[in-house]
Amino acid sequence: MKILFIFIYFSLINLLFSYDFEVEILSAGDERDTNIFKYSDTITYRHFNNTTNWKDNLGDWGKLQCAGNHTIIKNQGTILKNYCKGTNKDGDIFWLMMDRKSNDFDSGIGKIVYEKGTGKFEKYDGVQCVYAITFLPERDGSFIKSKCKFKDK
């Protein structure tokens, strides 16, 4: 019984010291930054570079530079791999990677992993987040919202 009490106690303490962190990313599309290669009737490959803006629910905001690719397979979905470098208003930097496998190019759910950071972002190393993306109807912009669970160190 004592062991169960200790386990519950430390589990509750762990929950108390974790908090949610949300990031919103807004982008405007520019076809000049996208290369499209139609591999076959069923596979289309898109490579892109873009710069977007982000803000979080902690009052921080900044710029995000990304490069990545989408592989769209007809009747099977899309696979995304995106690498980004973010800078906040104070000059702190973070690097993250976005992965998504979904049925639809225009919307889906994926994973963000913070690879490393400087300044305030040092403590985010290795943190994983879930994100959802929706593109505008003409695919000339998108909205991403991510939710992360951080632990204080």
What positions do the PLM features span?
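Structural motif marking the loop-to-transmembrane transition
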Residues: 1-4, 106
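Beta-strand-enriched cores of mature, soluble protein domains
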Residues: 19-153
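Sec-dependent N-terminal signal peptides
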Residues: 3-14
